[in-house]
Swiss-Prot record:
Function of the molecule: Involved in mRNA export coupled transcription activation by association with both the TREX-2 and the SAGA complexes. At the promoters, SAGA is required for recruitment of the basal transcription machinery. It influences RNA polymerase II transcriptional activity through different activities such as TBP interaction and promoter selectivity, interaction with transcription activators, and chromatin modification through histone acetylation and deubiquitination.
GO molecular function: chromatin binding; transcription coactivator activity
Protein's name according to its UniProt entry: Transcription and mRNA export factor SUS1
Similarity comment: family membership: Belongs to the ENY2 family.
Record carries keyword Transport: yes
Keywords assigned: Activator, Chromatin regulator, Cytoplasm, mRNA transport, Nucleus, Protein transport, Transcription, Transcription regulation, Translocation, Transport
GO CC terms in record: DUBm complex; nuclear pore; nucleoplasm; P-body; SAGA complex; transcription export complex 2
Taxonomic placement: Eukaryota, Fungi, Dikarya, Basidiomycota, Ustilaginomycotina
Main subcellular location: nucleus
């Protein structure tokens, strides 16, 4: 996933248009970049980033032949499961506030 992109899995169910509009507004307003910086800082401060890098390195070394798609399949659920609850809650709060402010403008 490139910087500035949202996973399309969240848009499943026909909400692609709304999803894309939200993503566009997040990027255009600069909120996407602010949230990305906040996420990186919080993950670094919590030690999650270091732990995840160590886990990823171990998993990569365990593969007989290094396969990036296979590694992503293993790492993605681990990343989602180990994301600190306070980080998830804080970012969801920031997104909710952004939506509240921007839905009034729509």
């Amino acid at each position: 996933m490139e910087e500035g992109e949202l996973s399309t899995g969240a848009a499943a169910g026909g909400g692609d248009e709304l999803y894309n509009a939200l993503h566009q507004r997040l990027v255009a307003s600069g909120e996407w970049q602010r949230l990305l910086i906040l996420l990186r800082r919080m993950l670094d401060e919590s030690g999650w980033e270091s732990e995840f890098q160590a886990y990823a390195t171990t998993k990569a070394k365990q593969q007989p032949v290094l396969s990036v798609p296979d590694l992503i399949d293993v790492l993605t659920p681990h990343a989602q499961d180990t994301l600190p609850a306070h980080v998830r809650a804080h970012l969801l709060d920031k997104l909710t506030n952004f939506l509240d402010r921007n839905l009034e403008d729509a």
